A protein has these predicted regions:
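Helix-turn-helix DNA-binding segment
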Residues: 6-41
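Hydrophobic residues on short alpha-helical segments
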Residues: 21-25, 52, 64
C-alpha cells in the first residue's frame, strides 16, 4: 500500500521527539537540549535513539540534512 504524497518521515514522531529532532538538527548538545526542554540527558538520548530508528537514519548529520531539506530548521 502506497502512502499518500503528503506524509513525511517526521509525521511518525511524537511532539517531544520532533522537538528533540529540531534541536539535534541545529547541532544543539544533548545537555543543552535537556535544559531547554526540562528533561534529563538520558531522556534526550532515548528520544534521539527512537526518532532515528523511526526515521531509519543513523546519525545527527542525516537528521540535519533531512530537517534542512524539509524546511524544519533555518
Amino acid at each position: 500500500i502506497d502512502q499518500p504524497d503528503d506524509t513525511s518521515l517526521h509525521d511518525c514522531l511524537s511532539e517531544r521527539e520532533f522537538q528533540v529532532m529540531c534541536f539535534l538538527a541545529k547541532g544543539t548538545p544533548i545537555k543543552e537540549i535537556g535544559k531547554e526542554l526540562f528533561i534529563s540527558e538520558r531522556t534526550v538520548s532515548t528520544h534521539r535513539t527512537r526518532l532515528l530508528k523511526k526515521m531509519e537514519m543513523k546519525s545527527n548529520s542525516e537528521l540535519a540534512l533531512y530537517a534542512y531539506k524539509n524546511n524544519l530548521i533555518e
